[in-house]
């Protein structure tokens, strides 16, 4: 796995799937989730998936889906919008994403763009810890992770 960081717009990263953190209600009304919902109707798409694929079971998980031609990964890291994600749920969601990426990388090296998940003004997690979880989850997997920070 290679991890790179850039400043810019996550939507201008051509050829990248987009991963983002969300709660289990799939409410997309703030931050990057709101932007994704405005562009790709993320909330409605997630809520339309079969219940087994999207049910909160007390630990983090990843939901892979597509909107038009854009592949998306919702990292479900907490039960409700007003809760703070704990690192174990973030780790579980990243491990679920890594497992999905590992299954799909038979032809092309997967490329995933994501913001600094769970580190915004609301969730307030420590980026150094999150970055370490990303490295742990993707160790040995052939993929590229691009962390996109706003300008």
Predicted regions and their residues:
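Macrodomain-like recognition of ADP-ribose-binding/processing modules
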Residues: 1-151
């Amino acid at each position: 796995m290679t991890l790179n960081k850039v400043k810019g717009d996550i939507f201008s990263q051509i050829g990248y799937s987009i991963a983002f953190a969300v709660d289990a209600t799939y409410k997309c009304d703030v931050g990057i989730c709101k932007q994704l919902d405005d562009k790709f109707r993320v909330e409605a798409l997630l809520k339309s998936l079969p219940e087994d694929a999207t049910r909160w079971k007390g630990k983090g998980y990843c939901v892979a889906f597509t909107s038009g031609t854009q592949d998306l990964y919702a990292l479900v890291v907490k039960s409700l919008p007003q809760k703070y994600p704990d690192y174990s749920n973030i780790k579980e969601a990243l491990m679920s994403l890594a497992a999905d990426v590992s299954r799909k990388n038979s032809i092309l090296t997967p490329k995933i763009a994501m913001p600094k998940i769970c580190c915004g003004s609301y969730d307030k997690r420590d980026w150094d810890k999150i970055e370490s979880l990303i490295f742990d989850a993707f160790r040995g997997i052939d993929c590229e992770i691009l962390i996109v920070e706003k300008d």
